[in-house]
């Protein structure tokens, strides 16, 4: 599938403001700006495996489209939600378990880049990845 590859973060847009809105402290925000995040995505039918490798952690997340699961962000924020495939976009709809606020994510291939867009409490950010 189109998402299957290893992707390395190339640049970010408004990521610091997004993390600030999420409640991430300034020290962690500065570190996260240089996390060298790499995603290895594989899809088998409705099942996705995403291996995240960064300065902070290495984890593997396995999910099925439309099936609710729990996920922890690098700063420890706990989320619960689902991914769905709408056209050529992976749509993530999550709620924080601590306050119930929504975090929505879209992953899409634009040209030769993977663009991951986040929206939380009206603040939008993007992280743009290139194939590694």
Swiss-Prot record:
Induction: By EGF. Its main location: cytoplasm. The modification N-acetylalanine is found at residue 2. Tetradecanoate binds at residues 83, 107. Changing residue 123 to G: Reduced stability. InterPro entries: Calycin, FABP2, Fatty_acid-bd, ILBP, Lipocln_cytosolic_FA-bd_dom. GO terms for biological process: fatty acid metabolic process; fatty acid transport; intestinal lipid absorption. Changing residue 65 to A: Reduced stability. Changing residue 65 to G: Reduced stability. Changing residue 55 to A: May have a lower affinity for long-chain fatty acids, such as oleate and arachidonate, compared to T-55. It is found in: Cytoplasm. It holds the Pfam family Lipocalin. Expressed in the small intestine and at much lower levels in the large intestine. Highest expression levels in the jejunum. Keywords: Acetylation, Cytoplasm, Lipid-binding, Transport. Hexadecanoate binds at residues 83, 107. One of its GO terms (molecular function) is long-chain fatty acid binding. One of its GO terms (cellular component) is microvillus. Changing residue 90 to G: Reduced stability. Belongs to the calycin superfamily. Fatty-acid binding protein (FABP) family. FABPs are thought to play a role in the intracellular transport of long-chain fatty acids and their acyl-CoA esters. FABP2 is probably involved in triglyceride-rich lipoprotein synthesis. Binds saturated long-chain fatty acids with a high affinity, but binds with a lower affinity to unsaturated long-chain fatty acids. FABP2 may also help maintain energy homeostasis by functioning as a lipid sensor. Forms a beta-barrel structure that accommodates the hydrophobic ligand in its interior. This is Fatty acid-binding protein, intestinal. It comes from Homo sapiens (Human).
